[in-house]
């Protein structure tokens, strides 16, 4: 019999059976198609040895005016800037809690009996017990007379612990202190003694137990949840092993006791970055002794970072809903359908600076031009100079590149703090902080008229597409006086998650709840040859984790998703928009950005590391790098519809090992035989195909002799060695008919 060339149609087809898909490919992992032929995908290498805390769900790369390359990394616990293979924590501060100040005032010996608020202290006070103030009064930290701070307003002198006006009586108020003691005003002679003293009252205190490394922190209405981070300053030693240096550092909250207290694990002095090992917070604990009876002193200040988010979406309510220790004992979980949603971030550049949004949370701003930007945290956008009516909550933000407006989706309306899930607001042009519409600016808002909530939005070259849970809308810049206009372009669609949409040139691709879609001027469902395979083994409860990414070097759109039995992402499906084919594989990733600013695509592993993809040939998550197991398997093929048995005696490989780094790359060719489409493979025969020379013509195993008999056959090609790169051509087999039984 003459040799038979094995040439299969590119792409994977799982919508039918293996036998009915004769002439095609049926299964694969970590293989792509180039010009119609299968090849092993590229490898990945770690970006440095440092790691980050939490599950990464968002990446954003950009370059500053000073040519600094930055990557924004949003995780379930923090927000980092990656620079020079290090991770710099810029997570915003939710609350800074200093000691309280109890102010007592007397005028000629008459003491104040009312609230502290009856004394107004202006910021022009410049002396505290004779020393220059370094901040607001009461923050200087000077303690006299057993925890009493004496405030000396400008225009007064201190004599014998009393304050005397140095000018006219009327200048008492102008000097910075307005005093009212049950109606008694500061009147009389010039030298009226006005005494204002501040007694510092601690808000945050510590309590240690002999033999334990747990420290109980008391802070009324702290607002924290488990795994939040707080940094303490100005604490003093508890008297023993728990020194001031141990207390005055950043801590992860280990357990929430109740709304007024929580626990931390005392640890040796180190930065959180230095004790983040393989993505895990790994402190070295310090145990208290019998001398640790103090409370940390009266000057303790705590800076609380914004609450961390969930790593896994939780459905339902009541006992067991949410994460252990996120609430107090006996408290209900505030859940309607999807509670305590997954921590997602959106981020975009405003010039060289970065605007950050916690999904269904606040909007923050990071100034890349600060004197030490990597040591500077992001701040609330509303705290910027000149800020006006900045949204306090939004589901997503982006910056319109065409017209330089900041857009907030699913945000609170002007004059209200209640989130409107269908509202779009936009800032003034070129002004990220001004959101108050006036006749002289371009700030404003729009309301989407379809759906129950805005799920996501993405910018194309011409417009911004806005996705609700049932429709797609086009948001376009019109200019004054309307600024933006919006119109519906499709309804009765679905979208899997806020990150399941990707824009490539003028096309937008997205994954729905049971379909794939594309927008190229109109919305269409994408015919998918692996649709049933994907959606029949898909954990819809974790759909928020689904994300889309592009690999434009290979004309690919990738969607990463969790399989049915996994709560984390473990699979991907790829659409090649040039070849119009589909394929899939297994890979655990949390976020991905295409090459552009960086030389390679960057992806976040679930192990706390970032990786350069399409870099090398191996799995760089291990040390040393390990092999990537890659394979592709054909559908069954036969002779004459399988009426006769077939006998295969020889395989003539056709493969290239171009660019492999190992000197002897090798793949395994396996022929499988079946008698019936639903039966098991009765025989397999595999042979290694090994490269032997590359000059002048690449040489490898000429032929392999096998003995295989069955009604139908399938070909499998696989590799599991390091340094391997291969691309399959058109192998041939020596096959002949061999009877009917």
Predicted feature residues:
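Beta-sheet repeat architectures centered on beta-propellers
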Residues: 1-98, 310, 314-315, 324, ...
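Small/polar beta-strand repeat architecture
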Residues: 15, 94-98, 109, 113-115, ...
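Structural hallmark of WD40 beta-propellers
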Residues: 67-70, 352, 462
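Predominantly extracellular/luminal cell-surface or secreted proteins
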Residues: 81-84, 231-237, 264-269, 366, ...
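Beta-rich globular "head" domains
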Residues: 221-236, 406-409, 642-659, 715
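Hydrophobic or amphipathic alpha-helical targeting/insertion segments
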Residues: 352-366, 373-374
